[in-house]
Amino acid sequence: MAHKKAGGSSRNGRDSEGRRLGVKKFGDEQVIAGNIIIRQRGTKVKPGANVGVGRDHTIFALVDGRVKFSRKAEGRVHVSVEPLPLAAE
């Protein structure tokens, strides 16, 4: 015969997985068109030249080039892509 009362069960112990947000390509890194530069919720970082914005505010490169981050007068960070110069053949 058991001499222990039944223990209660906890209702805690769950957590959701991280969303993998953040900067994927940093300043001066080379990107090819279509590369994701930043995954974000809302437009924390604003789009600049040669970048597109996805439905979920993901910023991605529209052209091959180098990533450039800049801080504008209003204090917002903008990201753009400087196109690579065409190689002389």
Curated annotation (Swiss-Prot):
It comes from Acidiphilium cryptum (strain JF-5). This is Large ribosomal subunit protein bL27. Belongs to the bacterial ribosomal protein bL27 family. GO terms for cellular component: cytosolic large ribosomal subunit. Pfam families: Ribosomal_L27. NCBIfam families: L27. Keywords: Ribonucleoprotein, Ribosomal protein. Residues 1-22 are annotated as: Disordered. GO terms for biological process: translation. The gene is rpmA. PROSITE patterns: RIBOSOMAL_L27. GO terms for molecular function: structural constituent of ribosome. PANTHER family: LARGE RIBOSOMAL SUBUNIT PROTEIN BL27M, RIBOSOMAL PROTEIN L27. Residues 12-22 have a biased composition (Basic and acidic residues).
